[in-house]
Amino acid sequence: MAALSHRLRSFTRRFSSTRTTQRSGGGANTKVPILYTSPDIDSDPVTLQLFSWGRGASGQLGGGIEEIRMYPSPVANLLFRSDQSFSLAQTPGRIDADSSSFRIGISCGLFHSGLTIDGDLWIWGKGDGGRLGFGQENSVFVPNLNPLFEEHSIRCIALGGLHSVALTHQGDVFTWGYGGFGALGHKVYTRELVPRRVDDSWDCKISAIATSGTHTAAITESGELYMWGREEGDGRLGLGPGRGPNEGGGLSVPSKVKALTVPVASVSCGGFFTMALTKEGQLWNWGANSNYELGRGDNLGGWEPMPVPSLEGVRITQIACGGYHSLALTEEGKVLSWGHGGHGQLGSSSLRNQKVPTEIEALADKKIVFIASGGSSSAAITDGGELWMWGNAKDFQLGVPGLPEIQTTPVEVNFLTEEDECQPHKVISISIGASHALCLVSRSP
């Protein structure tokens, strides 16, 4: 792994000064790097591929240059023994029920991307503010191993607009990047060029994290929710009046959401609102609601956490916040959407806002097992490994060439290139940024 890390760092330096923007379906490099190979690999390995697409002007696509990828193209390969098992890293909004220690996860920030493999963190993209955590602010155009986590095994990551958050297997939270919004949780509103541990405000280990462009959340093993970051009167932190000395502009240290009267298992941070999910599948939310992103039937927002009235008795297994819209996945595999629909992100064949959670009819005949939201786009993965996307397609972030800039209904994303030779594939995870996306695809020999 050390030799591989050295090769990739050299590879990064070769391309980091490139300023040519290309429009293509693939990256500049014909050979896809291998970021992980299982010990004692057999002759019939399983390949897990990382794909990217959309706008990559800051290197967030990981192809080595500034480019636009109109459809999914490989970034890296991970090789596993045919008998080796792994699980997905904890994803914001998704209840983590797997106890496996070998985890793989992805996350898209505004203009940067990350991949976790068995405790290691690979990160790339725009470096302004120190969001990559390498001690400087240079952009990185290919996946680069962050050596500062060699002593801390990473469980999962959540990338924000100008900052990054990581959770270790020991239950510690690390943040780095731009600190002007207070989203780092370090008391002072300054940038951090390298990962820094958030001082404990909680009594036990952290089990889940989430972040947006300006606020961050963490859940303890006992189900208590802590939040910090920017607050502009919308109530996104859920802390209410008298939350701290700097309550007018937010809170730069973690504070317990005392008004949330039930233990929660997962959390997702939207543009100006927050959603949390209990182990029993009950959805709570709070914050801004001018676009009906809380799904309560009116546009009255506020800091006080409340359950969604129309979802009483409905068991939710995953939630996903967009900039101004929300998604929820039911136990039966149905996708519900509500909030702002101006970019088609609700998947309802309309641009109208939706006041309450409504099933996406175009996916009604499919069983969905995973959902994701970007700023104004959405995605769903079926139990058969198909990927469907909808919403804002201006920067090709839906991965399907030829779409209108606003795609109001789900379209299937294909994964066929000359090198694939039409091998069977199964999408297992997706993350969406502002104008790009990543996914993990399992390929059979």
UniProtKB/Swiss-Prot annotation:
It comes from Arabidopsis thaliana (Mouse-ear cress). This is RCC1 domain-containing protein RUG3, mitochondrial. Induction: Reduced by methyl methanesulfonate (MMS) treatment. RCC1 repeats lie at residues 47-101, 118-169, 171-221, 222-279, 280-331, 333-383, 385-442. Coiled coil: none annotated. Mostly expressed in roots and rosette leaves of young seedlings, and, to a lower extent, in the flowers and siliques of mature plants. Preferentially expressed in the vascular tissues. Interacts with ATM. GO terms for cellular component: mitochondrion. Regulates DNA damage response (DDR) synergistically with ATM. Together with ATM, involved in the splicing of the ND2/NAD2 mRNA. Required for the accumulation of mitochondrial respiratory chain complex I. Negative regulator of plant responses to abscisic acid (ABA). May have a pivotal role in vegetative growth and the phase transition from vegetative to reproductive growth. Residues 1-22 form a transit peptide. It is found in: Mitochondrion. The keyword Flavoprotein does not apply. Its main location: mitochondrion. Disruption phenotype: Delayed development including late seed germination and cotyledon greening as well as delayed flowering time, short roots and mildly curled rosette leaves in long-day conditions, thus leading to extended life span. Reduced root length is associated with a smaller size of the root apical meristem (RAM) due to a decreased cortical cell number. Reduced mitochondrial complex I abundance and activity. Lower levels of complex I subunits NAD9 and FRO1, but induced expression of the alternative oxidase (AOX). The gene is RUG3. It holds the Pfam family WD40_RLD. InterPro entries: RCC1/BLIP-II, Reg_chr_condens, Ub_ligase/GEF_domain. The keyword Transit peptide applies. Keywords: Abscisic acid signaling pathway, DNA damage, Mitochondrion, mRNA processing, mRNA splicing, Repeat, Transit peptide.
